Amino acid sequence: MKNLLELRDEIDVIDKQIVALYQQRMQIAAEVAEYKIETGKKVFDKDREMEKLATLSALGDSAFNRHGIRELFEQIMSISRKRQYQLMTEHGIYEKPDFEELDALDYKNARIVFQGTEGAYTQLALKQYFGEDAGNSYHVETWRDAMEAIASGDADYAVLPIENSSAGIVSENYDLMVEYGHCIVGEQIIKIEHALLGVPGAKLSDITDVYSHPQALMQCARYLEGHREWEKHSLKNTAMAAQKVREDGMRHKAAIASRLTAEIYGLDVLEEGIQDNKQNATRFIIVTGKHVFTRKANKISICFEGAHETGSLYHMLSHLIYNGINMDHIESRPLPERNWEYRFFVDFEVNLNDPAVQNALRGLSEETTRLQILGNYEA
């Protein structure tokens, strides 16, 4: 029997041969890229790769080796494609996304829409983001109404909640972004501090019914667990809950909303800081109908769909990983009328002008069934 050192020496020799053959193969792959550049052929030929994988894996002398050979060559082919995408980008063959590059966004006299009523957290995010330009704003009843206002030209920008640090994503707004095809041009993160609000003179012992947005109720779950006798009611946002409590004028009704909302609607603060997570925050996106980005933009949001098969998500994300792109966030949403199939949303740190992202997006556009760039904005 050979000792371990002898076996390792043999493996080292084989590994050097593999490296030499790999580099030889990649050189030929580069020549393939040159041919495809000249002829306009696509890099990814799925039928050809599937046929080749089947042929190569059949050469294995056991089920284990056949599986391993297939996996090995899947990786080799994937790297080969990435090299070809890179060469095409270097040759200036890159279909740029339909986005206009601007020096800066102009918010002067902009019409801005938000969902809810006066005092909603969305309005607070709007004011923090737009500052002095926030004067020409108005509210609508639903998030869809806000997106419709952009589509119809009644508003230039909309502000939508997209994610909360405690309750997770606002799934409806992810779906609306895909449906309407609007563009994210900014984001605003605000700290969420919930308070229990009642009509003037109400006491904690009077309360039997609590109103708020479903996510706000979730974010105060531990506090509400201590008051199991209270009936919980969901409304479209926290400000609407405060407005209802004020209009009903009944001492047994309370709202979960912000202190600012209490001031707007003339309610008393019965308890403050009732959210479970004291670092609770919500991320809002700023949306417009024009596909634009600025030179300072440093975050991209995309969504994509892929084949419903083993390893599909890994292969799609590998385009970002291989190009050294740092992912901030990944989320999935079920595809309508296609049970157990999903659309993926990914945020990553980069600008559309970066060659690395151009390589990654080229690969994704060829190897996914659908790719949509939701926006490139400053975070």
Where are these regions (language model features)?
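Domain-level signature for soluble enzymes in the chorismate/prephenate branch of the shikimate pathway
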Residues: 1-379
